[in-house]
Amino acid sequence: MAEDVSSTAPSPRGCADGRDADPTEEQMAQTQRNDQDQFECQELLECQVQVGAPDEEEEEEEDSGLVAEAEAVAAGWMLHFLCLSLCRAFRDGRSEDFRRTRNSAEAIIHGLSSLTACQLRTIYICQFLTRIAAGKTLDAQFENDERITPLESALMIWGSIEKEHDKLHEEIQNLIKIPAIAVCMENGNFKEAEEVFERIFGDPNSHMPFKSKLLMIISQKDTFHSFFQHFSYYHMMEKIKSYVNYVLSEKSSTFLMKAAAKVVESKRTRTITSQDKPSGNDVEMETEANLDTRKSVSDKQSAVTESSEGTVSLLRSHKNLFLSKLQHGTQQQDLNKKERRVGTPQSTKKKKESRRATESRIPVSKSQPVTPEKHRARKRQAWLWEEDKNLRSGVRKYGEGNWSKILLHYKFNNRTSVMLKDRWRTMKKLKLISSDSE
């Protein structure tokens, strides 16, 4: 998916360095967004007044199509809000918050049956930050091609986000290219550094003054050359954070943030103490309503995704893009092919159970740039898609129970025979044995 993704519509944003691409069009677009947000806020306030038990006749005549559309709109609000939270966690270096928000955004994307151009761009931003966060983890795989490093994948996604912007786009693009090579050299992978160089700078039509110098540095294996100081990892992160600040200022005007701000302002003006029971009841009612809505969104959209090939491809393609390692090798180009089917659809029940089973999976990375803290050693290691595939192949060849033989003939990541046995039992319970596409 990280290859040249055909955008469904031009980005409605101005230049990322603060300049307006087209003042007239930008102002018109902003006015339309503000009008739409104001309309949505008014609709929300009117709906709050009407909250109550529905009449039996209304309940019987409920328009399922209207409900599905309303849930899709709400999911879009949550997606934009989670993108904001992800940006803040990335900027502030809060690794645990980044991971939790990433997983929440992933869950929202699971339920999207279609994408607007704005939602697609929002997803690209989340994917880009996820790759950057895993930039120094060379074994983190985001593409079908196992050779592609996280920063290379981020570079390809970046080309899909900001192509129309010149200055900031070019600066970040160059600042990603050099660290992508430097990270390999820092890990002693000089052969891999040469391969990354060829993939990034191999275009004969590209004219960059430092290409020959960089190639010489790689051949000399000079990891600490002064050249890398001008294109350091730190400078790359700082420049990306400046872009993140731009996204935060842009998306702070989204509907959900405006509605939340109005609620906060209203509560402040009432000057109610923390021990005021009516206020507490109001908050509880709002929370319960939100939880009910969220549950409805999850149930309805899961039903929609099961019957739509395009939705299934979106679900499968975006899931691995948020995790630090690729779990479904055939999913990456789904969005590139405009939501065409690549994987096999999974049942709604299996999706929900699988999602619960993977919620606690945390990528292990000693040098993840967003993580100032060390991961706890007690965190369980996530099972990769390749490991599940090898386990299924091993059982087919040697039979269930021959775990030692399967472990000997297939590649697993520091697993034991007991782990294979437990994983097989889990896969059978979650119905992952024959439904996953290989």
From Swiss-Prot:
Which domain of life, per UniProt? Eukaryota
Q: Where is the composition biased (Polar residues)?
A: 1-10, 299-311
Give the sites modified to N-acetylalanine: 2
Q: Which GO terms describe its biological process?
A: cell division; negative regulation of DNA replication; negative regulation of telomeric D-loop disassembly; telomere maintenance via telomerase
**Chain residue numbers at which the record places covalent cross-link Glycyl lysine isopeptide (Lys-Gly) (interchain with G-Cter in SUMO2):** 213, 325, 366
Provide the primary localization.
Answer: nucleus
Kindly indicate where the leader peptide sits in this chain: none
Does the entry feature the keyword Cytoplasm, yes or no?
A: yes
Which terms are listed as keywords in the entry?
Acetylation, ADP-ribosylation, Cell cycle, Cell division, Chromosome, Cytoplasm, Cytoskeleton, DNA-binding, Isopeptide bond, Mitosis, Nucleus, Phosphoprotein, Telomere, Ubl conjugation
Which Gene Ontology molecular-function terms are recorded? ankyrin repeat binding; DNA binding, bending; double-stranded telomeric DNA binding; G-rich strand telomeric DNA binding; microtubule binding; protein homodimerization activity; telomerase activity
Keyword Hydrolase assigned to the entry: answer is: no
Enumerate the InterPro entries for this protein.
Answer: Homeodomain-like_sf, Myb_dom, SANT/Myb, Telomere_rpt-bd_fac_dimer_dom, Telomere_rpt-bd_fac_dimer_sf, TERF1/2, TRBD-Containing_Protein
Q: Which PANTHER family does this chain map to?
A: TELOMERIC REPEAT-BINDING FACTOR 1 (PTHR46734:SF3), TELOMERIC REPEAT-BINDING FACTOR 1 TERF1 (PTHR46734)
Q: What does this protein do?
A: Binds the telomeric double-stranded 5'-TTAGGG-3' repeat and negatively regulates telomere length. Involved in the regulation of the mitotic spindle. Component of the shelterin complex (telosome) that is involved in the regulation of telomere length and protection. Shelterin associates with arrays of double-stranded 5'-TTAGGG-3' repeats added by telomerase and protects chromosome ends; without its protective activity, telomeres are no longer hidden from the DNA damage surveillance and chromosome ends are inappropriately processed by DNA repair pathways.
Name recorded for this polypeptide: Telomeric repeat-binding factor 1
Which organism was this protein described from?
Answer: Cricetulus griseus
